[in-house]
């Protein structure tokens, strides 16, 4: 009975507790939305990246328009026809320079707009691009515009907050030195002829072919045909007054040996309608000596061979534009102009 009474009392207490009112639960605080993550700032490109961007922008836009030129491959055969095109060549040279400036300026401004690292830009265009070089390029190259664009150099530097862009248009060596010897020599002959005979306005020059040479340099030269008569025919009319004579002639019997005046490298062995069979040697000081009208093409030497002063390079002949056996000697200076060989040989032969 006692156990039953205890169970009843416990049940009554639990029921009473269940009937008691409960206090309302405190409301949960409202949950704030999570803040969006702050995006990381876009990193500024470094100086090298900016310079690369500027160069890429230049080359993407630089495309000089040479659609008005005709590939002629005239060489030295039709100089009057080439000179008639001088205004076109001068215009192409000026346009190319202007286009280079415009493309460099635009590329620099584009880079400036993309970076707070740059406040100012500076553009410089340099190069020896004139109508004579353009004439050689248009005459000897199928696509001179693409060649000029490909050999244009662009350097970009950053000094402080200034972007400096320097565009260097190609000179003769950049355009032609890497090419095959026939193209290189043809272009050089033409370019040097134009430099020697015409000014910037294609007016004929009164050029006596003088060039200052030191006694030390003269000592490196020998007379190729001692005791033979040397004719000073520099700058005389040739080919019915369509061109000037770029050298001096030395009379000699056919098959007489021709030694090299200087030590140097054989850069050209070939034939053309004016020079006939010829050999050209570039000496150790950058002068080119061409020996023309040889009786036959020299086969015992090859282009690229080294020859020493006095070494046999061929034999006197009467080939090409010649009416009697003789050696035509021409000399091209490192500045790409022909010089008169007569006073050079006179100093070698007579010491004055």
Q: In which residue ranges do the predicted regions lie?
A:
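C-terminal motif of bacterial Sec signal peptides marking the signal peptidase cleavage site
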Residues: 12-13
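Surface-exposed, glycine-biased beta-strand/turn segments
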Residues: 189-277, 309
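Residue-level recognition of beta-strand microenvironments
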Residues: 233, 269-270, 294, 316-319
């Amino acid at each position: 009975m006692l156990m039953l009474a205890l169970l009843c009392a416990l049940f009554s207490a639990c029921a009473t507790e269940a009937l008691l009112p409960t206090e309302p639960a405190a409301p949960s605080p409202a949950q704030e939305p999570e803040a969006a993550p702050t995006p990381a700032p876009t990193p500024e490109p470094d100086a090298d990246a900016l310079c690369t961007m500027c160069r890429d922008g230049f080359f993407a836009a630089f495309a000089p328009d040479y659609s008005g030129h005709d590939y002629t491959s005239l060489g030295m055969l039709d100089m009057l026809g080439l000179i008639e095109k001088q205004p076109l060549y001068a215009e192409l040279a000026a346009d190319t320079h202007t286009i280079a400036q415009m493309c460099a300026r635009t590329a620099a401004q584009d880079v400036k707009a993309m970076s707070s690292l740059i406040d100012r830009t500076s553009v410089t265009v340099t190069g020896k691009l004139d109508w004579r070089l353009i004439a050689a390029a248009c005459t000897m190259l199928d696509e001179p515009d693409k060649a000029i664009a490909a050999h244009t150099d662009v350097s970009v530097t950053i000094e402080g907050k200034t972007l400096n862009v320097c565009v260097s248009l190609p000179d003769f060596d950049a355009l032609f030195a890497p090419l095959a010897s026939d193209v290189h020599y043809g272009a050089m002959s033409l370019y040097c002829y134009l430099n020697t005979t015409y000014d910037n306005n294609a007016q004929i020059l009164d050029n006596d072919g003088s060039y200052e040479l030191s006694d030390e340099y003269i000592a490196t030269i020998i007379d190729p045909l001692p005791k033979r008569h040397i004719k000073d025919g520099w700058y005389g009319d040739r080919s019915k007054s369509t061109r000037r004579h770029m050298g001096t002639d030395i009379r000699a019997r056919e098959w007489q040996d021709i030694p090299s005046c200087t030590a140097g490298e054989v850069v050209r062995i070939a034939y053309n309608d004016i020079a006939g069979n010829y050999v050209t040697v570039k000496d150790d000081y950058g002068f080119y000596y061409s020996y023309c009208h040889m009786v036959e093409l020299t086969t015992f030497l090859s282009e690229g061979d080294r020859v020493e002063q006095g070494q046999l390079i061929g034999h006197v002949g009467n080939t090409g534009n010649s009416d009697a056996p003789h050696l035509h000697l021409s000399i091209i200076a490192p500045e790409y102009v022909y010089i008169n060989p007569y006073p050079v040989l006179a100093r070698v032969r007579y010491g004055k």
